Every structure is written in C-alpha cells, then in structure tokens.
C-alpha cells in the first residue's frame, strides 16, 4: 500500500498571494494623463490650482533653504524636492482641526497647516521660538528620533477619540522608519483601539544610504498593515491626485470610527538625506536619478492642469516670485529675532524653578546684563 502523501500548509503561497494584492495605485501617469478615471478626486478647479501653487512654492522653498544652509543662515535641513506630492497632497486632504506629527523632512506640511515660515526657519536654527507653535496650529515639532512620531501619533489619535473630536492625527516617516520598533508599536496600539490615525510611509528608497532592499524582505511596506489588522495601501507618491485620494479615504474611515490606515507613497528625494554632509552620489547612480526625474510630481501635475487649461508659465512665474518674496521676508524676520539666552531657555522650561536652578538663573542673568 502506497504511503499517504503528507499535505503541506504552504505558508509561502499564502505570503506570495498576500503580497501580490498590494499593487501601486495611480491616477495620473508620468505624462499627466488620467489612467484611473474612477478614482479621480472630487476637487474643484480652484482647489487643483491651489494644490499646484503649494507644490511650486515648496519647491522654491527647498531650493532657497539649501542655499541658505550653505550660507550658514539655516541650521539642520532635510531637502524635500521630489516629495512634494507625497507631502502636500496628503496635507491638502486634512482639515484644520487635524493634527500633524511630522518627521524632520516634513516641515512643508506644517507650514501649510498654519506654521509661519519664520518659525520654521527658527526651528532649523535651533531657536526655542521655532518650537513654540501659535495657538490653532495643530501640529507637534518635527520629530528627530526616527519612528518615534508613530507612537506619539497613536497617543494623539487616541486622545482625539476619547475627547469625541471629529479629527485625525497623521504622521510621516520614511522607508527606514518602518524598520524601527516604534513604528510597529504605534500602528499596533492605534489599531487595537481604533484610534483615528493615518500613518504615512514616504518610501523614497533609501534610509540615508541604505536601500530599501536591505531593510526588509517585504515586497511592499504597505503590507505591514496586515500584521496589526488595519488597511494598507501603496500609492504612486509622485502622483498628487492618488496621494490626495488615498489620504482623503483614510481620513473618512478614521472619523467614521473605523480606525487607522497605513499609506505607503512611492516617492524619491532628489537631494541628499540632509545637508549635514550626505553625498547621494556615493549610493545612487545618475541613471537612477534620471529615471525618477521623469516622474517629477510638479511636471506631471503641471501637464495635467495645462491639459485642463488651468495652468500656464505666467501663473507659475507668479507663484515663484511670491515664494521668493515670502522667503526673503521670513528669513529677515528670523534674522531680527532676539537671540536666545541661557535665562530665556530656563524661563520657558520652568514655571517654578528648583532652588539650585534659580540660583544659577540669577548668575546667568547678571552675566547677560553686562
């Protein structure tokens, strides 16, 4: 009698079947043509133009910030060119009452959420006023510890739910951040309590210089949502419409009490990781850069709007000049901001200083008065 064949669980097939379901969602192709009519968001012509204006303005801000950094007039700076659709189209899907918990590359989102540009410059300089956001700007200071913002976002979203607020908390990290323990802890907590959170992974292919292929065996980062039981979606991060629609749907789910969503945006940063000495030519090829430049989010969205008769060179030049004027005024205001002192730092840290610090405070106060 022939032996009975032993059945197998075939866990590999289950994995492959699961990973194959995460296909990148796209609405606009590289030439600005609509390839998925059913998913085109319900945005007015005025809103489409406004989103483009923000993207152009932010590209100029990035160029000027790099220049200001090289002049020694800005401190820490993480370039954003290439990621405008991923950053700004997602922010555009938010409401004023929503909270943004940014990473250090995500300053543009909080600027468009209400943070004055001057304060963004002061944050870069390490001035304490750059961390004192005005009342009504629902955002935390950019998180420097990679991935830590995911835990904070879970907490903020949970608080919004407990308080009965019709709002969400959204956060951003890069592909490298999704390899951090805080990433999993944050999405797991938010999932367990159905907190109104949106978790965005801006997959720009490199964690500083480490390619995504050396960070994880997962075919997509969106599929990491499955482990905690929440929806995950991968979208073309160079496609403003796709990013907007994915974020809008995630927000609708969240405020309806259906819990968080994980969004992976496939994007690319054209510049270095930060201006602190990173040289991308050591780990990226010029051919790779050229391929991604063909997918430029501004070029793509510009073509889309031009085809609709909503955009032209004159309009773009107006935005560019306005951006330059805004930046010039903001950096001048930052230059004229009173320099921080030891006593000013102590004053904002304590309402009632311990005796030993109060004594030190008086010593520094006397020194600073001379």
Curated annotation (Swiss-Prot):
The keyword Transmembrane does not apply. One of its GO terms (biological process) is branched-chain amino acid catabolic process. The lineage of its organism: Bacteria, Bacillati, Bacillota, Bacilli, Bacillales. This is Pyruvate dehydrogenase E1 component subunit alpha. Its EC number is 1.2.4.1. Its cofactor is thiamine diphosphate. The keyword Nucleotide-binding does not apply. The pyruvate dehydrogenase complex catalyzes the overall conversion of pyruvate to acetyl-CoA and CO(2). It contains multiple copies of three enzymatic components: pyruvate dehydrogenase (E1), dihydrolipoamide acetyltransferase (E2) and lipoamide dehydrogenase (E3). It comes from Staphylococcus aureus (strain MRSA252). It comes from the Bacteria. InterPro entries: Alpha-ketoacid_DH_E1_comp, DH_E1, PdhA/BkdA, THDP-binding. It is an enzyme of class 1 (oxidoreductase). Gene3D superfamilies: 3.40.50.970. Signal peptide: none annotated. GO terms for molecular function: pyruvate dehydrogenase (acetyl-transferring) activity. It catalyses: N(6)-[(R)-lipoyl]-L-lysyl-[protein] + pyruvate + H(+) = N(6)-[(R)-S(8)-acetyldihydrolipoyl]-L-lysyl-[protein] + CO2. Heterodimer of an alpha and a beta chain. Keywords: Oxidoreductase, Pyruvate, Thiamine pyrophosphate. NCBIfam families: PDH_E1_alph_x.
């Amino acid at each position: 009698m022939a032996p009975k064949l032993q059945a197998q669980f075939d866990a590999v097939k289950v994995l492959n079947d699961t990973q194959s379901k995460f296909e990148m969602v796209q609405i606009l192709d590289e030439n600005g043509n609509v390839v998925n009519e059913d998913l085109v968001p319900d945005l007015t012509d005025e809103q489409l133009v406004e989103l483009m204006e923000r993207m152009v303005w932010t590209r100029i801000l990035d160029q000027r910030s790099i220049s200001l950094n090289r002049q020694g007039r800005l401190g820490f700076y993480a370039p954003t060119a290439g990621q405008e659709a991923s950053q700004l189209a997602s922010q555009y899907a938010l409401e004023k009452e929503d909270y943004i918990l940014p990473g250090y590359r995500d300053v543009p989102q909080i600027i468009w959420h209400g943070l004055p540009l001057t304060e963004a410059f002061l944050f870069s300089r390490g001035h304490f006023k750059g961390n004192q956001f005005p009342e009504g700007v629902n955002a935390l200071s950019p998180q420097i510890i990679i991935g830590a913002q995911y835990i904070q976002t879970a907490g903020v979203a949970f608080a919004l739910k407990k308080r009965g607020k019709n709002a969400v908390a959204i956060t951003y990290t890069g592909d490298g951040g999704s390899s951090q323990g805080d990433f999993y802890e944050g999405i797991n907590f938010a999932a367990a309590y159905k907190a109104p959170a949106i978790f965005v992974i801006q997959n720009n292919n490199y964690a500083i210089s480490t390619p995504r292929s050396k960070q994880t065996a997962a075919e997509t980062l969106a599929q990491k949502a499955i482990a905690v039981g929440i929806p995950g979606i991968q979208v073309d991060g160079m496609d403003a419409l796709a990013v907007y629609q994915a974020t809008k749907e995630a927000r609708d789910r969240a405020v309806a009490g259906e819990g968080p969503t994980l969004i992976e945006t496939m994007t690319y940063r054209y510049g270095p990781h930060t201006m602190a000495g990173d040289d991308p030519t050591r780990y990226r090829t010029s051919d790779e850069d050229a391929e991604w430049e063909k997918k430029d989010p501004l070029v793509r969205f510009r073509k889309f709007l031009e085809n609709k008769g909503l955009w032209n060179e004159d309009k773009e030049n107006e935005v560019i000049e306005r951006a330059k004027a805004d930046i010039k005024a903001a950096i001048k205001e930052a230059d004229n901001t009173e320099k921080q002192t030891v006593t000013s730092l102590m004053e904002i840290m304590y309402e009632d200083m311990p005796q030993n610090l109060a004594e030190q405070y008086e010593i520094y106060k006397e020194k600073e008065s001379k």
